[in-house]
């Protein structure tokens, strides 16, 4: 949205970026857990060691995940932090005590709001936005390679990279709506996060939802058209009509059919309906991953067939990520500006009276002592 100069992003970008970082933190836990020995989690990193020429296996998708998650987290964190610098300065100047003033002063990096500060800030922010855009595509493509490079029916498919990228944008906007609706309702921010913002996000969700739905159709069609009996049996006898078939139909309903009501303006302008639809979409995206994995519970040998039922530890570990995500989210709402103060000032009518440079100089003189 920043690259396309969409001004309406201002009210939602801060919460969306925070959500991304917190979600990546939760996601980074799972490769460690799946290793079985998390205390050896540093082994996939290319670190100097005493074993001579021992290096990670760069052919392993697990190592690709390490680089994808760490790169995504690093760039997202820097992008989020750079956007916060002017707001840290605003909070610093209004801090109620010396300790908070010192903490926010360190975080604001000596920001004074001069024209040179603004010039360097906007240049850095634009460069990071440009870097983040292809990074989103590459990261989710690499995640899809975890499945696509495996020579297994149902996984070895070229549709997976665009399918995962569209799904990431789809579920991302659904999650932003799930956060924006309670925030605007309980924090009294309906003047900042307006019905127009929800309407625009719903339209993007509808467009990406159609892409994901198309991916489901291509996946089913290619399983039939390829004349590969293993692909066909996996799709028809396992996913659709197998023991987990009801999850597949629930997935089609949640991700494909339910969002079609977003074609109607009345639905897009109803925040309660949008919240429910977004929640259903997020459930559907979880079911998508579940169906991808659980469809392999019937191997090539019938002796290896079995039914999966989650244990207490499976459920509690998964619910723990919800707790971690919500804890970080509430801390964010408590100690940081949920909406970009600096960018909101640019949208005020009086900010367009002068030129861009003059508006910064006017802001500096109005706040006295900013140089």
Region locations from a protein language model:
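C-terminal TM-helix exit segments that contain a strictly Trp-centered aromatic cap at the helix terminus
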Residues: 28-39, 215-222, 285-295
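Functional transmembrane-helix hotspots
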Residues: 35-52
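Interfacial and helix-entry/exit segments of alpha-helical transmembrane bundles
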Residues: 15-22, 190-213, 273-284, 347-349
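Membrane helical hairpin/interfacial module
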Residues: 1-39
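Non-cytosolic membrane-interface motifs at loop->transmembrane helix junctions
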Residues: 12-13, 153-164, 303-310
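TerminUS-proximal long segments
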Residues: 252-259, 265-371
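Transmembrane alpha-helical segments in integral membrane proteins
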Residues: 1-4, 72-90, 175-185, 256-272, ...
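Long, contiguous internal "core" modules enriched in hydrophobic/ aromatic residues
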Residues: 49-251, 354-362, 367-370
């Amino acid at each position: 949205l920043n690259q396309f100069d969409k001004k309406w992003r201002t009210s939602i970008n801060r919460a969306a970026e925070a959500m991304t970082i917190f979600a990546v933190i939760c996601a980074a836990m799972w490769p460690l857990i799946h290793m079985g020995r998390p205390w050896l989690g540093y082994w996939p990193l290319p670190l100097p060691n005493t074993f001579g020429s021992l290096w990670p296996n760069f052919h392993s998708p697990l190592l690709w995940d390490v680089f994808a998650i760490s790169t995504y987290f690093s760039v997202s964190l820097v992008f989020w932090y750079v956007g916060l610098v002017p707001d840290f300065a605003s909070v610093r100047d209004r801090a109620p005590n010396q300790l908070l003033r010192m903490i926010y002063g360190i975080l604001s990096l000596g920001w004074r709001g001069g024209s040179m500060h603004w010039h360097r800030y906007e240049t850095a922010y634009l460069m990071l936005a440009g870097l983040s855009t292809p990074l989103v595509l590459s990261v989710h493509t690499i995640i899809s390679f975890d499945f696509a490079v495996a020579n297994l029916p149902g996984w070895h498919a070229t549709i997976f990279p665009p399918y995962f990228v569209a799904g990431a944008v789809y579920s991302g906007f659904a999650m932003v709506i799930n956060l924006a609706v309670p925030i605007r309702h309980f924090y009294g921010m309906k003047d900042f996060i307006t019905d127009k913002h929800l309407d625009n996000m719903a339209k993007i969700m509808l467009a990406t939802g159609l892409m994901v739905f198309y991916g489901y159709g291509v996946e089913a069609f290619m399983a039939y058209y390829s004349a590969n009996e293993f692909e066909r049996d996996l799709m028809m006898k396992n996913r659709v009509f197998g023991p987990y078939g009801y999850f597949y139909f629930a997935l089609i309903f949640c991700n494909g059919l339910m969002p079609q009501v977003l074609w109607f303006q009345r639905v897009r302008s109803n925040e309660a309906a949008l919240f429910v639809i977004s929640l259903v979409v997020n459930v559907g995206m979880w079911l998508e991953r579940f169906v991808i994995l659980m469809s392999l519970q019937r191997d090539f040998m019938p002796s290896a067939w079995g039914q999966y039922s989650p244990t207490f530890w499976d459920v509690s570990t998964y619910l723990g990520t919800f707790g971690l995500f919500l804890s970080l989210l509430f801390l964010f709402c408590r100690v940081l500006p949920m909406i970009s103060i600096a960018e909101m000032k640019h949208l005020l009518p009086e900010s367009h009276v002068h030129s861009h440079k003059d508006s910064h100089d006017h802001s500096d003189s109005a706040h006295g002592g900013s140089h």
